[in-house]
Amino acid sequence: MNASNPCRRFPRSARVRTRAQYTVVFDTARRTSDPLLSLHWRSGETPPRLGMAVSRKVDTRAVGRNRIKRVLRDAMRHLLPELAGGDYVIVARSAAAKATNPQIRDAFVRLLRRAGALPLPAAPGTMPPARAPRPSSLSPTEPDPRSD
């Protein structure tokens, strides 16, 4: 669980749960892939929901499959406030079984950004956007004392 709030769980309202919901996403959604994960998403006005498919082809041991799901749920829980609405279904690939937790999390964030569900991070070293000019204390009829 989360270290700052250990009781906080991934809410049921933020999950794709039924076979019908998965079918709708797979039939009508767009898809983008990474070597570790594949993301199927369907934009919408609804709050963001996550579904996961981690088959026995990925890892024959339940412990390995559950680790992948746990990492994805935790990443989603932290990203939920800034995530665009819609349904997101993650399909794990066999390479995810050998990946570390940070690698899985980074692949998930990368796919969400590629899908446009998360804002792109600002490039390092870039200047912030220019602010609107403040109104001058001088009126337009008074000459500027600095111009002399």
UniProtKB/Swiss-Prot annotation:
Chemical reaction(s) catalysed: Endonucleolytic cleavage of RNA, removing 5'-extranucleotides from tRNA precursor
EC annotation from Swiss-Prot or TrEMBL: 3.1.26.5
Residue ranges of the TM segments: none
GO CC, any one term: ribonuclease P complex
Pfam families: Ribonuclease_P
Keywords: Endonuclease, Hydrolase, Nuclease, RNA-binding, tRNA processing
A biological process term (GO) from this entry: tRNA 3'-end processing
Enzyme superclass (EC): hydrolase
UniProt region (Disordered), positions on chain: 119-148
PROSITE patterns: RIBONUCLEASE_P
GO molecular function: 3'-tRNA processing endoribonuclease activity; ribonuclease P activity; tRNA binding
The protein's role, per its UniProt record: RNaseP catalyzes the removal of the 5'-leader sequence from pre-tRNA to produce the mature 5'-terminus. It can also cleave other RNA substrates such as 4.5S RNA. The protein component plays an auxiliary but essential role in vivo by binding to the 5'-leader sequence and broadening the substrate specificity of the ribozyme.
Subunit description: Consists of a catalytic RNA component (M1 or rnpB) and a protein subunit.
Protein family according to the UniProt entry: Belongs to the RnpA family.
Name of the molecule in the record: Ribonuclease P protein component
Organism: Xanthomonas campestris pv. campestris (strain ATCC 33913 / DSM 3586 / NCPPB 528 / LMG 568 / P 25)
